[in-house]
Amino acid sequence: MDHNMHVNAPSLHHWGYAAGPGVVMPGATATTPQSHWVPPPQSHHSAHSNHSHGHSQGHSHGIGSLKRTLSESDCDDLYSEESSKEQISPSEPGSCQLMSRKKRRGVIEKKRRDRINSSLTELKRLVPSAYEKQGSAKLEKAEILQLTVEHLKSLQSKTLDSLSYDPQRVAMDYHIIGFRECAAEVARYLVTIEGMDIQDPLRLRLMSHLQYFVQQRELSAKSCASPGGWSPAAPSSSGYQPNCAAAPYQSYAAPANPGAYVSSYPTLSASPSQQAQQLGGRTSVSRTSGSAVTESLPSHDLHSDSSSQQQQQQQQQQQQQQQHQQQQHQQQQQRTQTTPQPTQQQHYTHDHSAVHSEQQVPTYIELTNSNRPAAIGSDSLSYSAAPQYPVSGLPGQDYNNSSVLQYATPNGAKPYRPWGAEMAY
């Protein structure tokens, strides 16, 4: 019995090992129907092996259950982290920070999109081609950007010389435009206001002169259009062409006195004294202002006119000396009346004293004195308004001395008016 049990023990042990955990061995139940059966000592090894096998199986089962428990906890932890990212509960401390970060990110992104859209709308309004296409169809963002690039390229091609921009040239262009407008207004004034014919020689000469002048200014402006013609340090108030050569018509400098541009020849309706005053006044103005107005009246013409007038005055003086020999008492009375008058006449001759000393031309002044001498007859009073001529009847006095002037009117004779002789010159 013991031997059989001992022999059957390995088989039972082998069968029980192959059976797996939790399976009741049928041999054990068959041989030991009673639950209180005590195995023999020989079976101690098998029992020990069974116990060790069961313990190993239980240990392995415990390890498997432990591993399963750890894996399930890891999955639960991962799921909880993912769920916390998706569904943030306000009870957690880091949930508020995550929520605020998400909100800030959304607000920043919205602002960025709004800024891009507003800039594209502004470009669509500013670019001409995009503005023209705006009414026909809705423009996409890429199309707006493409039209903007094309517009910038066209601007760059048109303004390649933007670095060599010359403000002086622009000012000169405006000046030429204004000059042409003024010339057109002058032509209109001569026809409509002055009643001058369109084919009038004076009008034609004036317009041709203005056209030639503006052409010269345009040529001078083009000559100054070189890159080195303008420097930023040049003052803007010095004129349009500070660095350029003067045009041929720029020699007509503007006079300091605005009344210096007067007629270069005396009017025929003026008296000889007024003509001499006009000539002397123009010469003094031209010398004091330093302008080139006297070029229109050469110096030899002035000397020839003054010499001819001097000869005429000498003839007049000779005739008047013969007449004054008959009226000696009238000359004495007139001398007594005119001697206290140098201070009254001084302001007439003060302006032209320098010119008279240079040209040696006597100046004749028309005086209308209210205090007339009583000895002058009624016949001579009718000619008191006419210009009178001085007479150097006193010995030791020069006729060029303008401080003492003698005036006399012959009885019954008109004063000498050499209009024909002066018109011949």
From Swiss-Prot:
UniProt keyword list: Developmental protein, DNA-binding, Notch signaling pathway, Nucleus, Repressor, Transcription, Transcription regulation
Domain called Orange: residue spans: 174-210
SMART domains xrefs: HLH (SM00353), ORANGE (SM00511)
GO cellular component term, pick one: nucleus
Subcellular location: Nucleus
Every bHLH domain range: 100-155
Gene Ontology molecular function terms on file: DNA binding; protein dimerization activity; RNA polymerase II cis-regulatory region sequence-specific DNA binding
Compositionally biased spans, kind Low complexity: 272-297, 305-346
GO BP: any one term: regulation of neurogenesis
Sequence motif YRPW motif, location on chain: 416-419
Main localization category: nucleus
Function: Transcriptional repressor which acts as a downstream effector of Notch signaling.
Protein name (Swiss-Prot/TrEMBL): Hairy/enhancer-of-split related with YRPW motif protein
Organism: Drosophila melanogaster (Fruit fly)
Gene from which the chain derives: Hey
